[in-house]
Amino acid sequence: MDVFLAGTDSLKLTRLARRDPELLLVPAGDAHLTRRPAPPDLRALRICLPEIMSGFSPAAPLELDFFTRSSRSESRSLSSRALLATLPEDAFLEVLHSDGDPWADLGNETCRLFVESPGLNLVRMEQSLRMMVERGALSPNAALFRLLTFPMEACGSYVRDPADPAFGACLFELEPIATPERILALIDEVSGIRGLRNARLAAGLSQSGSGSPEETLLSFAFKLATHLGGIESPAFLENEPIAWPHEDLPFVEHTMMRPDFHWPGHRTAAEYNGRVHVSEAAFEEDQRRIRDYQSCGISAYPASYKNVRNIAALNSYLACVAHSLARREGPGYESHVRWALADEGSTHMRTVLLSQMLPAVPSEKPSW
């Protein structure tokens, strides 16, 4: 039994697999061309699916992909999509056990589970969000900002809770399952499906390395144009190691650091520390890191949830970082940022950005 999950159910299993060290997500090549799924046995499907996905019903149907109209299931408990678009290799990932075995042995047959690759899932998400916009449930800008969050998660080192992505706890320090370049390459090879333009835009604005939902928020607050709520900062690196200059090594306590955001040519770094650090050990580690940055001539700006929890706090933090960047960019850049932070339209967009990207529960990132 070959099962190709679609849309939100595909995303749910993708997140579950990323969180489970006993599971792998492996590019499936041309499985969507060679395996050709048939309508599944619903009883067997309930048995082999994870518990959080096995309660599908006519009121909450399971989303599945089929690749011909004739192969679609007629069951009201399944939302069967005939995916007739032209898809490249690796448009899907297979969920395997860490030893390489397929999902489940049902005795008389093997159950193989496939999920949409991050690129295809991004297109599906765009379609779903567009329907919400058409129903008046979301504004177009809110839909765009929500769309931007997924490629940053897939290309980053965190994953949201599959059962409750808005309120559930994230898991951190994971391997990414995509890069923006791979997502864009897949989207460029797809044809015959809606949602490609906005999916391509979202992938083009994303970058690898985000370590938490709050870092994703800050990344876009830094990089987006002012009419979208950002401060149009110069390009930066995310979570890439800094190797200290040899002459500075006698003065630092860490041989290497990995700032969340780093502008190498501007001698500026920004770090998101999760919840407020209240323990003595965490406070001392914060101080050591700041001293190391200062010893090497880098202005570092640590942030916690209180710096992003509302528009006033976020504006204040962005102004501080912009002030440091202006030493290289010039006073005109800082004036432009201050105008954007005071402008009603830009502030409104930043408020929408916060509403779609700020997690309801602060991320509890691991200590250094």
Tell where the protein language model's regions lie, with residue ranges:
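Short gly/ser-rich loop at a beta-strand->alpha-helix junction or flexible surface loop bordering the NTP-binding
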Residues: 1-194, 332-333, 341-368
